[in-house]
Amino acid sequence: MTTQVVNVIGAGLAGSEAAYQIAKRGVQVRLYEMRPVRQTPAHHTDKFAELVCSNSLRANTLTNAVGVIKEEMRLMDSVIIRAADECSVPAGGALAVDRHEFAAKVTEYVKNHPNVTVVNEELTEIPEGPTIIATGPLTSPDLAAQLKELTGEDYFYFYDAAAPIVEKDSIDMNKVYLKSRYDKGEAAYLNCPMTEEEFDRFYEALIAAETVPLKEFEKEIFFEGCMPVEVMASRGRQTLVFGPMKPVGLEDPKTGKTPYAVVQLRQDDAAGTLYNIVGFQTHLKWGPQKEVLQLIPGLENAEIVRYGVMHRNTFINSPNLLRPTYQYKQRDDLFFAGQMTGVEGYVESAASGLLAGINAARLVQGEEPVVLPSVTAMGSMANYITATNAKNFQPMNANFGLFAPLEKKIKKKAERNEAYATRALETIQNFVNI
């Protein structure tokens, strides 16, 4: 057994998973958790992996990408998924848990491992030696300042302001056209033209739609230069037409005329399977958000893979800073995991901790860190956060749009998703003993 110790900072979903994966590989772990010495605005206990929002870990079926990532994690002995399975409550096709029992179970499994030493103190500096930073969206101010200094001000963020992302295959291409404003450079945007009547219908639905209530510690985010589209709309009907829906320079090639308003979609991934809705960061609830977006011509049947969100979230610009092993590019023995890396969601956070933990253990044991193929759910997430466009990087949930394309195109969605799942689980079998 190696005498080196790996520091893991944060005992949330990612940190708990990382600590467990390191410990079970015979490596000593020093797990730092500042609670209960210092609480966050969202936590209520000193337990590991406390779920601060929903008690659902989302879909549990293989027809959904997050169901696939769970199954991959089961195969790789995830402590988070094991505890969730043991503490599950009825939730249809989803995996929901008794949150108190779940946190207690994770705490028990991790804390009682002979290779784990828990240190209840707040770290304000990044330690030397092998370290995983998994401090989550509510990282303490002192450590956040250190991370900002490490990564550079331009690569460290304090909130999400993410526009919705849709699957390209679900866009009605007969209603949209490819063009850049004033034809500058290559045609890079899909444009959804609106008549005045279509815009009026969209506008009225937008300003009437229900928004998510802000938590007290989130109220400053709208003053950081990123306005939700519904707040812009509330300032007057023309605000959008002169803002994100500005039509000038975007003549419709079918008519030769400038539409009344235009919604632009920009490619979001290297494979060109996902498009984000430009300038549409929003705080609308997901149900109303879908109804409003489907009033946009061409998006009537759009499959939304990530809804627009605006909330407090400490994260880094992973495409510039991380490798798909979750290693920091400038320091091989420093890893990041969890929502701080730009993965979004309970399961995705734990999955990043699983891979970061495995790779930290491999590093101190003199083995090469592992890159999972992007045909797997875990590999596709690691690939997305490290290979996507750094300029417009925003956190992302697991979805099939991130997976490497299938060799053979399958038209029916259910069959296509099944093929993604089958290929992923066959591939992950090659990594279960790493």
From Swiss-Prot:
Its main location: cytoplasm. Keywords: Cytoplasm, FAD, Flavoprotein, Methyltransferase, NAD, NADP, Transferase, tRNA processing. GO terms for cellular component: cytosol. It catalyses: uridine(54) in tRNA + (6R)-5,10-methylene-5,6,7,8-tetrahydrofolate + NADH + H(+) = 5-methyluridine(54) in tRNA + (6S)-5,6,7,8-tetrahydrofolate + NAD(+); uridine(54) in tRNA + (6R)-5,10-methylene-5,6,7,8-tetrahydrofolate + NADPH + H(+) = 5-methyluridine(54) in tRNA + (6S)-5,6,7,8-tetrahydrofolate + NADP(+). Its cofactor is FAD. Catalyzes the folate-dependent formation of 5-methyl-uridine at position 54 (M-5-U54) in all tRNAs. Belongs to the MnmG family. TrmFO subfamily. HAMAP family: TrmFO (MF_01037). This is Methylenetetrahydrofolate--tRNA-(uracil-5-)-methyltransferase TrmFO. GO terms for biological process: tRNA methylation; tRNA wobble uridine modification. FAD binds at residues 10-15. Its EC number is 2.1.1.74. It comes from Bacillus cereus (strain G9842). It is found in: Cytoplasm.
